[in-house]
Amino acid sequence: MSKFFNSPTVGIDVSADFSFVAILAPNGDVFKKPFRIKHDVSGFNHLLKEIKKVEEEFNMKTAIFMESTGVYHLSLFHFLNKNFDNTFVINPLVTKCNKNVDIRKVKNDKKDALSIAQIGKFQNIKLSQSVSMDIF
């Protein structure tokens, strides 16, 4: 069982220009339907406000999970990591294995964001909390 089992969790499916975000309540129910943010100051600030609402609602820290996506997740990861203690990157092989569990192979960004939030909340997996900005 994950150490974030009793925490609200955020799952983020990152792509080049935007991300889909899903938020789970501490009991595992969907707290906020998956929504889209752009990778710009306005989008990042909107996400910041949504996560702070969750923390105020439940009076506890939120765990934030996103899949490693080459370079696309780096700006969002560093923005969130600066604002929240529990920001983590999940190996894409872990999320791929979890997608293979479903009988129906449905692929969409909203479902992927929800799946990432559930993986972080319910599974005891290896997480990365630091990402190097060094390229060479």
Per-range role (PLM):
Residues 1-136:
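Phosphate- and other anionic-substrate recognition elements at nucleic-acid/protein interfaces
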